[in-house]
């Protein structure tokens, strides 16, 4: 009989003995590196744009056991834009909820007040407006589709989402979540990082800087210079290139100001590059 894979199998460093857990709390969240690099959570655009560009992640197919076993080579992510201000916080809440209650099941229930706290929303703001915002974010996250196909021309496909079920029962004030076990491998040790949230908390409403932080946090030590073209792609901004570059420079400066980043910006030919000297998730780079 096939053994069901649950969240506890991938939130621990040792899946055999369930030892050395990766801590999920108000200052840390576990995030798949792929999610942080692909631009699933991006800043709100300056003008209306409900849908993000299709994200082709076919190059990751060799890392998915599910994709290899089923012969899927064409993998795409589509759906509404997920912002940093609310949607990313709700996603953090989802990860934390599963880290607490998904030990033996991929389907969990918890009180709305607890879920909102896990998302990082103050308890004193649990009003009708916040409930509506969280419910809308759950809908958007559930609607983010991941499609697996056996080649671009194949008519056979497997469609799933970032989460299988996201249900908020306003009558009982309960949130119900269910995950697709086929995607748990995204959280395996080689492909996940502990994202510390000090910078997110220090950048309220500064979505470009927040999104840039999550991308830079996913990079390995001593990364190569990063072109602004790559940063524009990751942030999925929709303004003119010149304006995008200005916005990116402002966000980089903000990360430097809060003590998260020591970096230089240089121009080579027609392109700008970010050169990272040091990163400090605890915002202590200026004191080091």
From Swiss-Prot:
GO biological process, one term: plasmid maintenance
Keyword check for Cell division: no
The organism's place on the tree of life at top rank: Bacteria
GO MF annotation, one: DNA-directed DNA polymerase activity
Function: This protein is essential for plasmid replication; it is involved in copy control functions.
Family label: Belongs to the initiator RepB protein family.
Designated name of the protein: Protein RepA
Native organism: Escherichia coli
Record gene name: repA
